[in-house]
Amino acid sequence: MPSTIEAIYIILIAGELTIGIWGNGFIVLVNCIDWLKRRDVSLIDIILISLAISRICLLCVISLDGFFILLFPGTYDTNVLESIMDAVWTFANNSSLWFTSCLSIFYLLKIANISHPFFFWLKLKINKVILAILLGSFLISLIISFPINGMWYNLFKVSHEENITWAFKVSTIPGAFKQLTLNLGAMVPFILCLISFFLLLFSLVRHTKQIQLHATGFRDPSTEAHMRAVKAVIIFLLLLILYYPVFLVMTSSTLIPQGKLVLMIGDIVTVIFPSSHSFILIMGNSKLRAAFLKMLRFVKGFLRRRKPFVP
């Protein structure tokens, strides 16, 4: 019988998982329906579909890992199963971060105005550049997650010892080096997002100064687009700053002994990022926002028309 803390954990994780899968599933569903209707798909739709699918996978893996540790603590006594879970988690996490960096780069190339030949070339080739980054992101995540994970497992399967109990989770130094190597790979998309943010901010400041010189007295569409993009990237960075350190602690059992309570809190915090960011993406995209509001109106109308049940 789960304790009170464990019951609260299960309720919170189940709620976050439901919200996250619903939000990301909504993004995939709306874009796929629009794709089938128009027989065409835009670049931003491809990015959002890829990001939402990776987020769904990440949510499922995080939640599954938490339930295993809480309800079936002996599950990871088999190193093979732990290696598989590590690989899938690393792949889902890295691909999610890489696809988000693609979204930040797309905002940058689509909206920012920077007078540099290389930037102009990137803007002209935006479709090819973003598609190349998407494909490269997928391949990099795949290589980092599965072959490297398998290589480390085969290399240290004799010396790598692990003890998972209700009290703590500890591993040896070879496993620590492996996990740090895999986790540091996720820093690259984070750095790309930071670069995109600062370039967008630079472009916004520069554009605002030009508007002030002309003394128009109101914001033009370009300024509004800059502001929306900067706000979207800022929110993403804040969520990522909350998520990434906790993720590092959660996956660094090789260096930091972790109590059951720490693992549960870590799971709850890490699920916030992929769950909440989906709704920020929905409200920041005109097509998704319109579909979401239409759905809300339908639900509201359905509830109004529904007659109360009288026994």
From Swiss-Prot:
Domain of life: Eukaryota
InterPro entries, sorted: GPCR_Rhodpsn_7TM, TAS2R
UniProt entry tagged with the keyword Membrane: yes
Pfam families: TAS2R
Cytoplasmic side: 33-52, 110-128, 203-233, 284-311
One example of a Gene Ontology biological process annotation: detection of chemical stimulus involved in sensory perception of bitter taste
Protein topology in the membrane: Multi-pass membrane protein
GO cellular component: membrane; plasma membrane
Keywords: G-protein coupled receptor, Glycoprotein, Membrane, Receptor, Sensory transduction, Taste, Transducer, Transmembrane, Transmembrane helix
TM annotation in the entry: 10-32, 53-72, 87-109, 129-146, 180-202, 234-256, 261-283
Glycosylation sites: 163
Family under the similarity heading: Belongs to the G-protein coupled receptor T2R family.
Chain's role: Gustducin-coupled receptor implicated in the perception of bitter compounds in the oral cavity and the gastrointestinal tract. Signals through PLCB2 and the calcium-regulated cation channel TRPM5.
Other comment: Several bitter taste receptors are expressed in a single taste receptor cell.
Record-given protein name: Taste receptor type 2 member 9
Chain's gene name: TAS2R9
